[in-house]
């Protein structure tokens, strides 16, 4: 699971940060998912290896402009590219479909591929081969949702090298061993396939929460996540601004990470008032939760799977 941060500023762009958008590339799939699509996102994509022709889904946390205004231009550019008639599905709060249809109509923009819409509610958003997406309501000035992308658990890895060392002939026997069965070899030995297949690999979990002030629903959504991406618009010194706008401080985001027992916290959605530096935000977050990274535009982050150890192979003579 590979993340590319396309925009990490809140409200307005700065010289070094565009407004919010995050790209997600999933393993063994050529599709691209976006989370939010602020103004200028398509320009950001042009400066990365990403391709709009691979865009499959866009998930919107809420409908404020710094998360939305880049969508229609991006869809229009995709229609002029090599995507053909491959559809795009848009997920978001009520009003998303009305906004997109009206903007396309009044700008006389024609899209040559299907656009599908799904209004998001707390709970299951989708479940398809390999992945499930869940949503939960956040606490912001308008309807807002956080998302969790959960990879389904994977079968354990088959150790073909060890099988070869044991003199097991390559062929149909490998399929039986991969399935964890005990097989008889031509020389009379038996091999327990379970000892050549690692433990089931737990799927990875990514949670994204923005925009929101501290809320228990974010903790519920992020519980046990490998990576939590959480907005950190302000530092605690500007708590009054966070409370007024229903945004999070870096300390609030760190509390969510700690209470949800996540592995890694990535902060994003920084107010332009901190353009000179984010040291204060990082310091206050690390005082609560040590594994903190500060997102930057075009930064790529891989969520790596945790590999389990194989047991010792059991071979009976």
Swiss-Prot record:
Homodimer. Zn(2+) 2 binds at residues 66-67, 211, 269. The gene is rnz. Pfam families: Lactamase_B_2. It catalyses: Endonucleolytic cleavage of RNA, removing extra 3' nucleotides from tRNA precursor, generating 3' termini of tRNAs. A 3'-hydroxy group is left at the tRNA terminus and a 5'-phosphoryl group is left at the trailer molecule. Zn(2+) 1 binds at residues 62, 64, 140, 211. Signal peptide: none annotated. InterPro entries: Metallo-B-lactamas, RibonucZ/Hydroxyglut_hydro, RNase_Z/BN. It comes from Gloeobacter violaceus (strain ATCC 29082 / PCC 7421). Zinc phosphodiesterase, which displays some tRNA 3'-processing endonuclease activity. Probably involved in tRNA maturation, by removing a 3'-trailer from precursor tRNA. This is Ribonuclease Z. The lineage of its organism: Bacteria, Bacillati, Cyanobacteriota, Cyanophyceae, Gloeobacterales. Belongs to the RNase Z family. Its EC number is 3.1.26.11. Binds 2 Zn(2+) ions. The active site is at 66 (proton acceptor).
């Amino acid at each position: 699971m590979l993340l590319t941060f396309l925009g990490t500023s809140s409200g307005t762009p700065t010289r070094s940060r565009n407004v919010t958008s995050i790209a997600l590339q999933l393993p063994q799939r050529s599709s691209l998912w976006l989370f939010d699509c602020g103004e200028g996102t398509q320009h950001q994509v042009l400066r990365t290896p990403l391709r709009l022709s691979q865009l499959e889904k866009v998930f919107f946390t809420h409908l404020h402009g710094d998360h939305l205004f880049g969508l229609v231009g991006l869809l229009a550019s995709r229609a002029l590219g090599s995507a053909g008639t491959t559809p795009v599905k848009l997920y978001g709060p009520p009003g998303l479909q009305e906004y997109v249809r009206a903007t396309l109509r009044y700008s006389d923009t024609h899209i040559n591929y299907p656009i599908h819409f799904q209004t998001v509610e707390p709970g299951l958003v989708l479940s398809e081969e390999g992945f499930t997406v869940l949503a939960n309501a956040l606490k912001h000035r308008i309807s807002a949702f956080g998302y969790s992308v959960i990879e389904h658990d994977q079968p354990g890895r088959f150790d073909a090298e060890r099988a070869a060392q044991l003199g097991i002939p390559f062929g149909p026997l490998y399929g039986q061993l991969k399935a964890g069965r005990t097989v008889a070899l031509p020389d009379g030995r038996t091999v327990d396939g379970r000892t050549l297949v690692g433990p089931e690999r737990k799927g990875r979990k990514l949670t994204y929460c923005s925009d929101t002030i501290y809320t228990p629903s974010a903790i519920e959504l992020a519980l046990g996540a490998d990576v939590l991406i959480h907005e950190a618009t302000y530092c605690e010194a500007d708590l009054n601004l966070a409370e007024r706008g229903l945004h999070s401080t870096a300390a609030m985001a760190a509390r969510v990470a700690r209470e949800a027992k996540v592995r890694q916290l990535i902060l994003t959605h920084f107010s332009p008032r901190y353009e000179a530096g984010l040291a204060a935000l990082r310091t206050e977050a690390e005082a609560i939760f040590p594994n903190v990274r500060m997102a930057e535009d075009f930064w790529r982050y891989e969520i790596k799977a945790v590999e389990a150890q194989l047991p010792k192979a059991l071979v009976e003579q």
